Amino acid sequence: MKSNDLFRASGIMALGTIISRITGFIRGILIVAVLGTTLLADTYNVANTMPNILYNLLVGGALTAIFIPQLVRSFEHDDGGDDFASRLITTISLILLVLVTLGMVFAPALVRLYAPEFFTTGFETEQEIAIAFTRYCLPQIFFLGLFTMLGQVANARGSFGPLMWAPIANNLVGIALFGGFLAFSPNVDISSITSTQVQILGWGTTFSVVVQALVLVPVVKRLGITIKPKLGLRGLGKSFNLAGWTLVYVLISQLGYLVTVNVATSAAVRSAQEGIKTGVGYTPYTYAYFVMLLPYSIVTISIITAILPHISKLALDGKRDEVKAQLVRAIRLVGVITVPSAVAFLFFGPLITQSIFIGIPTEDSRYIGYVLSALSFGLVAFSINLILIRGFNAFEDTKTQVVSIFVINIIAVAMSYFFLYFLKNQWVTVGLGVAFSVSYLVGLFVTLGLLKKHVGKLAISEFLAQHIRLLSASLLAMLPLYALTKYISWVAPDMTRAGRAGELLLVMVIAFFGYLLTAKAVGVEEISMVRHLGSSITRRSAKTSENE
C-alpha cells in the first residue's frame, strides 16, 4: 500500500470514527453532567470499565490480534472459511457466557480488587453502588465478544467500515439514556441516588452494547458468510496456541491498568477524607484519556485496521522489507496527526476540557485538562508502539512483544505507586498521566529493538527526522497561541464557559491552518495526505447511503 492508498482505505473508517467520537463526546458530556467527576462517577466508571477489562484480559486481545491472520488463511479452505468462523464464534461465545456468570457472582471481589478503598469505613454507600453497577454492566462481556467477532469476520473479508460505524449506535443509545436521565433526575449525588436509578443507568449502559453488537449481524449475512452454531475445536488449535502469548500480553496490560484504577480511586477516597470537593480520581483520568485517544482513534486505528491484513499477507509471502516499509509509512502518516495533537493537548488541555465538560464545576473540568496535558507526552509513542505491535502480529509472533509490554508496565506501575505516596492526593491522578507517558516513551525503544528479528534493523532515524519537523511546525504554530491564551486568562480570569469555548474555537482554527503552513514550510511531505484523507472522507460521506 502506498501512502495515498492507506489514507483512501482509511477514509471510510476515519469518517465512522469521527462521527463515533463526536457522539461519544456528547455521551461523555452527559455522563459527566449526570454523575459529575467525584466518587459517584468513580463507582459507575469502575463498574463500566470492568466488562472491558475482563473481556480484554481473557478473550479480546486474542481475537483482535490473532484471529484476523487466521481468518485470512481460512479463506483458502474449500468452504471459504465458514467452518472456522462458526467454530470460533461458538466456542468463544460459550466461554464468554461462563465468564459473565462467574463475574456476576463474584462482583464484590472484583470491586475490592480494583477499588479497595471503597471498602474503607465511612464509604459503605460507594461500595454498595459500585457492586450494583458492576453486576448490571458485566453482561456487556458477551456482547463485546460478539461485536468483536462479527466485526473481525467482516474486516477479514475486506469490509472495514461497519466495525467503525457500529459504536455510533452504542453512543446514540447512551445519549438517549443519560439525556433522559438528566432531564428527569438532574441533581443526583452519592447520597441521593436510588437503587432504581442505579438499575436504569447500569442496565441501560449494557443495552447500548447489545445494540452495538446486533447491528453487525445483517452486515455479516450480506457478505455471504454462513455462521452456524458448531461445537468443536478442530481448526482452532493453532489459534489458541498463538492466543496463549497474547493472553500473557493482555494480562500484563490489565494488571498495569488494575494499578491505575487502584491508585486513582485511592487518591479520590483519600482526597474526600481530606475534605477536597474537586473530582481528582479515576473519572478525571478516564475522560482525559478519552480525549487524548481521539486522534489515535481517528487515524491510527483506521490505518492499522487497513494495513494489518495486507502486511499479514506480505509476511506470509516472505516480503520482510515490504512489511518494514509499510510500518514506517504508517508511522510517518500517523505522526502528521498525533504530533500536533500532542502539542495541542499539552498547551491547551485545561481550555479544551473546560469547553467540553460544561455540566460540572470549572475546577472539575480544569482538572481533567491537567491530566490530559500529562498524558499528551505519551500520545505519539503510544501510537507508534501500537503500529509496531501489529508488525509482530503479522509474523504471528505473540511471544516477543510480551517483553515490550512488560517493560512499559513495570515503569508505569513503579511511577504510579511513587506518585501515590509522594504527591499530594489531589495531584496523584495527574501523576498517573505522567507515568503513562514516560512508560510508552521508554517502551518505544524496546519495541523497536525487538522487531529487528523480523524486519531487520528498524531505526528510529527512519521517522525521527520527520517527527522533529512535525514537532517544529506544531510549536511554531501553537506557541504564540499558547501565550495568547495565557494573556486572555490573565486579563479575563472569570470568563464564562461560552467565552472559553469561543476562545478554544478561535485557537484551534488558527492552529490548524498555521500547522499546515509551517509543516509545508519545514518540508513535511506527508502533510498533503491530510487533504487526501479529507477528500476520501467527504466522498465516502456522500456515498454512505448507497453503499452502506
Tell where the protein language model's regions lie, with residue ranges.
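Membrane-embedded alpha-helical bundles of multi-pass transporters/translocases
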Residues: M1-E548
